[in-house]
């Protein structure tokens, strides 16, 4: 009989691989007799970097190829940032575990550590999110919002290379990468309401693979799972 092996599907960005390796470590510590492998899968959202997400299908583009790999049984689990997940899933798949949440709010990184309220009139602020753009323009209609794509490192570099005054990113990713010192300000949810599931990592699998779901049972934050179910109903 062939020994059991778990394959985790992940995007290839440093943050995605940090999350996948964290899940791998959790699985291996709980199941030392089961080897775990990470399989890197490039998604449409990773391939298309020069067009705003809203124009090419939205944040679901970061999960499509991962879900296809699950359906083909190329991988057993797919690890996602929950903020990238669409509300609807393929019928044969499910989120089997939502892990403990990191800081769910958005963070400002600015030149000279300037806070949002202190940015000069007409300041150029980079972000790739329609959610952030609409809320920021409501709060500071004088700001000039610049489309921003790429992984965390790329977007942080663009603060310098594209002459931006500030950029806005999810705080959770910066914290996980050990870059808290780059954060100028955690933005209040009264100004910028975060995305559904922001800060949480979700593990997707096939509905009928009960044995695999059992492996994840004690990694699930039950309260957070209930919060995630309720968040799609929030007005934005």
List each model region and its residues.
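Beta->alpha turn/N-cap motifs
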Residues: 42, 81-85, 169-174
